[in-house]
């Protein structure tokens, strides 16, 4: 499973790959927000998770 995290405070998008497939939402949030994990702020992040989550980078086309 992959987790994509949009972190407004750091102005970045993170892609965490190869997380355990057995994780439930509680465990994902503990990893993202917990002191023993990434220790990110809930108020400045959004996340999504799944097997097919990826980041696609594109150039602006006028």
Regions found by a protein language model. Name each.
Residues 29-62:
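Short, mixed-charge low-complexity intrinsically disordered segments
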Residues 1-31:
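N-terminal acidic leader/helix
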